[in-house]
Swiss-Prot record:
Any GO molecular function: structural constituent of ribosome
Quaternary state and interactors: Part of the 30S ribosomal subunit. Contacts proteins S4 and S8.
Role, per record: With S4 and S12 plays an important role in translational accuracy. Located at the back of the 30S subunit body where it stabilizes the conformation of the head with respect to the body.
Position of the signal peptide: none
Protein's name in the database: Small ribosomal subunit protein uS5
Lineage: Bacteria, Pseudomonadati, Pseudomonadota, Gammaproteobacteria, Thiotrichales
Gene Ontology terms describing biological process: translation
Length: 169
């Protein structure tokens, strides 16, 4: 299922539904069906979170996933509307490649990765996922790759140097 923007919540967060799956539990009398939902929540200004929820009904599963995503928000250090530097990130079978792009490029990424980037507030990026394309793995890997990115200001503060020394200007 493609990512859908549900609404902008009462707290100003962008909420996106990435996937809904029907899951089955096999019991003695047959199968018991339920639903699993994966959602992404972000403020569009550098904070993003994801969550998954399970329930017997789709709306309840989505609500649980949204609550978990809100509790799981993380900061992303962006450079304007794009990334600080190119990212190659590997987690499990997912291999994430993201490149900063010039203004006006837009978000060139597929499905689940696009939902995360839009919710985080990234405006211009080139991105690709090699390996697994399962939405849960792609979302988890993309969020971890984005949160692992550091700004030059943070690196300079850690090293006790000025930003000019770090950037070599």
């Amino acid at each position: 299922m493609s990512s859908k923007e549900l609404q902008e919540g009462q707290d100003g967060l962008v909420e996106k539904l990435v996937s809904v799956r029907r899951v089955a539990k096999v019991v003695k009398g047959g199968r018991v069906f339920g639903f699993s939902a994966l959602t992404v929540v972000g403020d569009g200004e550098g904070r993003v979170g994801y969550g998954s929820g399970k329930a017997n009904e789709v709306p309840v599963a989505i609500k649980k996933a949204m609550e978990k995503a809100r509790r799981n928000m993380k900061d992303v250090h962006l450079d304007g509307g794009t990334l600080q530097y190119p990212i190659n990130f590997k987690q499990g079978a997912a291999n994430i490649v993201m490149l900063p792009a010039s203004d006006g490029t837009g978000i060139i990424a597929g499905g689940a990765m696009r939902a995360v980037l839009e919710a985080a507030g990234v405006k211009d990026v080139l991105a690709k996922c090699v390996g697994t394309t399962r939405p849960v793995n792609v979302v988890r890997s993309t969020v971890n790759a984005l949160t692992g990115m550091s700004s030059p200001e943070l690196i300079a503060a850690k090293r006790g140097k000025s930003v000019e020394e770090i950037l070599g200007e």
